[in-house]
Swiss-Prot record:
GO cellular component, as recorded: ribonucleoprotein complex
Swiss-Prot/TrEMBL GO biological process terms: pseudouridine synthesis; rRNA processing
PANTHER family reported in the protein's UniProt record: H_ACA RIBONUCLEOPROTEIN COMPLEX SUBUNIT 3, RIBOSOME BIOGENESIS PROTEIN NOP10
Pfam families tied to this protein: Nop10p
Protein keywords: Ribonucleoprotein, Ribosome biogenesis, rRNA processing
Keyword Protein transport: no
Organism annotation: Thermococcus sibiricus (strain DSM 12597 / MM 739)
The protein's name: Ribosome biogenesis protein Nop10
Length: 59
């Protein structure tokens, strides 16, 4: 079963459409991806998050 409900990242409106009816922004899936214990991209995702937040990054 595919998820159909989407959420606008700009205004937070939930919809079934590809674009937000209120602001016209492209919507994204409202559900997180499935959890996998063998997360193949976990290391990269955590590294990106640390870099984005500036944690443990040498400047």
């Amino acid at each position: 079963m595919r998820f159909k409900i989407k959420k606008c990242p700009k205004c937070g409106e939930y919809t079934l459409k590809e674009t937000c009816p209120l602001c016209g922004e492209k919507t994204k899936l409202a559900h997180p991806p499935k959890f996998s214990p063998e997360d193949p991209y976990g290391e990269y995702r955590r590294r990106l998050k640390k870099e984005t937040l500036g944690i443990g990054v040498k400047k």
